[in-house]
């Protein structure tokens, strides 16, 4: 097909005589009358009859074995329009609404989907096609009850399973939604990922052996045997599974429960033609087992196009066609857009239904005519009648229980703890790099402050080294926590929205799994730096120092959790963290004497873990230093006569050591509770 032919087809023209019916604006009523008459009397492009019932494949997954016909009717979807300064304007409008008696003006909305209808039967593979911006993903999100914030489905829209209205909870029990972007914990292997999914997805009455057996079965069915022990990896950072293997792994996660309805958004995105064909073949096999499979796809190859049982073409948020691929050829030929011989029909349909830059008015007029012609066709009228009467094909079976989550609280906690522990052991950034970094910094500080003596200069150096203990533990743990925790938050958000586990089980399992690491790091650091610097000798003094440094490490880790949960991205968390830490650092007693803190900022000093830890470490170092132990070698400088004098100079008291321990413990609990609340609030906003 030449360039001239392509441009002619994109404009809406054709070398076939029938094309004039679509694009000749002067023919007007006569052309429209001919099209309407053809659709109303003889033509039936697209059928609503379901395919022949497939054989029951059976499954040991514990999922309901039922065939589902999914229909949707009158789906109007609106989206909020982003305007410059809209967040500030919204805040101002809300404030004025509280204090002023002004009429509320609703925010502008964009009509994303317009009266979209459709139906998908068990045993068939339905492909939703269209150009970018046609509304494919918006439709799938609405069908799966996963519409993001700012997207509103009109109350008049109906979603029916076997003729019965369905809500989000019922859909969740029967539908698996594979989204376009694959989110995994990259340090796990494919098999470990599926075992975790089986522990939280499958019904609670199944034993562990039954779950593992189902994992093995799914691995065989989706051809994942060769890569089941390969780590998933992180694209662009850690090498792992290929794109096709990652996509099949996403299907396997959903197929564990053998759901009767499978919705996939762009399953071939970013894949080569061979891999894309293998992925669609997997979906085809699933549909042949009696499942209802709906997917979106941009421009499939001719081989892929032949695998589809039915196609739903969308343009400008409207339905342009619904039927079999062969019926689509007849439909577009009849409305005057005949697909040329030896040309991929999928490419042709996307070109015809696309808005061409520079020809927007002409393109939208062509699209409107095609959509209007389908709306008055016999298949559209039959579908309207079918959905309006809500004919029951087969009553919905009731779920096996009324539980919101498939797994019990303890099963969820054990699964999350197991996965988090594996990721801690396998994540090089979290373990190997941290331990190497800790060792190198401890040796460096030890060499700089090597063998300090109890002199005027030694006192100052020891105080500085102790404060470096705190700053190193703080920044190292805060940034490490932010980098790792925020990278897993998208996985948590998706899994929490899918009701795989509770927010509290995730947070508790995650923090407990990382606890051994945050105990090991301060131990390694203190064991190296403490004797090299020559801090106060004695086992009790060493373990007091170790306990305080460990508490600081866990306070800073808790603070890192809080910043991560309250931030929308890793970059934002890394930007917010240092400015928030600096005020706490200033109140630590090293840069600013504790007695010099302004009264109006006194409350902030009680939130500083630097203050409690610095006071505790200095008490541990100087409290029992008797007069005469400090050598005064310089006569022209003030020399502290004892450790008590040093503490009094800094406005610290040896009697406050227990309070320092309590203060650090309270900060650990407080920061983690606030982090959990922020995480829970964030998860609820996504629901």
Swiss-Prot record:
Changing residue 588 to S: In co2; normal eye color. Eyes are brown due to a reduction in red pigment production in a bw/brown 6 or T50 mutant background. Residues 1-30 are annotated as: Disordered. It is a multi-pass membrane protein. GO terms for cellular component: cytoplasmic vesicle; cytoplasmic vesicle membrane; pigment granule; pigment granule membrane; plasma membrane; presynapse. Its EC number is 7.6.2.-, 7.6.2.6. It catalyses: 3',5'-cyclic GMP(in) + ATP + H2O = 3',5'-cyclic GMP(out) + ADP + phosphate + H(+); guanine(out) + ATP + H2O = guanine(in) + ADP + phosphate + H(+); riboflavin(in) + ATP + H2O = riboflavin(out) + ADP + phosphate + H(+); (6S)-5,6,7,8-tetrahydrofolate(out) + ATP + H2O = (6S)-5,6,7,8-tetrahydrofolate(in) + ADP + phosphate + H(+). Its main location: membrane. Disruption phenotype: Eyes are white due to a defect in color pigment production. Malpighian tubules appear clear or white. Loss of st/scarlet protein in the pigment cells and retinula cells of the compound eye. Transport of cGMP, but not cAMP, is inhibited in Malpighian tubules; however, basal fluid transport rates or rates stimulated by cGMP in the tubules are normal. In Malpighian tubules, uptake of guanine, xanthine and riboflavin is impaired while uptake of hypoxanthine, guanosine and adenine is not affected. One of its GO terms (molecular function) is amine transmembrane transporter activity. Coiled coil: none annotated. Expressed in the head (at protein level). Expressed in the eye, specifically in retina primary pigment cells, in the basement membrane of the base of secondary and tertiary pigment cells, and in retinula cells (at protein level). Expressed in the retina underlying lamina in the epithelial glia that surrounds the array of lamina cartridges (at protein level). Weakly expressed in photoreceptors, specifically in terminals of R1-R6, R7 and R8 (at protein level). Expressed at very low levels in medulla and central brain (at protein level). Expressed in principal cells of the Malpighian tubules. It is an enzyme of class 7 (translocase). Keywords: ATP-binding, Cytoplasmic vesicle, Glycoprotein, Membrane, Nucleotide-binding, Pigment, Translocase, Transmembrane, Transmembrane helix, Transport. Residues 441-460, 519-531, 590-644 are extracellular. It is found in: Cytoplasmic vesicle membrane. GO terms for biological process: aminergic neurotransmitter loading into synaptic vesicle; biogenic amine biosynthetic process; cGMP transport; compound eye pigmentation; eye pigment metabolic process; eye pigment precursor transport; gravitaxis; guanine transport. The chain crosses the membrane at residues 420-440, 461-481, 498-518, 532-552, 569-589, 645-665. Changing residue 509 to D: In Et87; 98% decrease in drosopterin (eye red pigment) levels and undetectable levels of xanthommatin (eye brown pigment). ATP binds at residues 130-137. NCBIfam families: 3a01204 (TIGR00955). Belongs to the ABC transporter superfamily. ABCG family. Eye pigment precursor importer (TC 3.A.1.204) subfamily. May form a heterodimer with bw/brown. May form a heterodimer with st/scarlet. This is Protein white.
